[in-house]
């Protein structure tokens, strides 16, 4: 991958990372304020349900941040944009759509097919 593309994806990943960190902080701030402002039991139950959803979202953000950090490390070590299974280049279109991709479309489809077969066998 050329340096221009690497810079583009580094910037895209860093912007995505910053956005997720801000959203995570907002979620945390919201959860803290929710804890203080609880009324009756029905309201508490409703808020707890909402908080569970927010915590799940926060966990997804954490996992996504880990994948973004891994992609940034691959940019630094020169392996970004190459399939971890086949070593082939991952298409720019795929990386544009999913900059954290580690597999080509074909390799991803093979992996998903294998996982479906394994799941169906058990």
Name these PLM-found stretches.
Residues 8, 85, 99:
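Amphipathic alpha-helical recognition patches that constitute DNA-binding helices
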């Amino acid at each position: 991958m050329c340096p221009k593309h690497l810079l583009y994806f580094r910037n895209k990943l860093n912007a995505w990372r910053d956005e997720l960190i801000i959203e995570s902080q907002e979620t945390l701030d919201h959860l803290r304020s929710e804890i203080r402002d609880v009324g009756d039991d029905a309201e508490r139950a409703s808020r707890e349900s909402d908080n569970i959803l927010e915590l799940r979202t926060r966990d997804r953000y954490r996992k996504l941040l880990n994948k973004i950090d891994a992609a940034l490390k691959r940019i630094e070590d020169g392996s970004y944009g190459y399939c971890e299974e086949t070593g082939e280049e991952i298409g720019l279109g795929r990386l544009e759509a999913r900059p954290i991709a580690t597999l080509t479309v074909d390799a991803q489809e093979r992996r998903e097919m294998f996982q479906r077969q394994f799941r169906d066998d058990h």
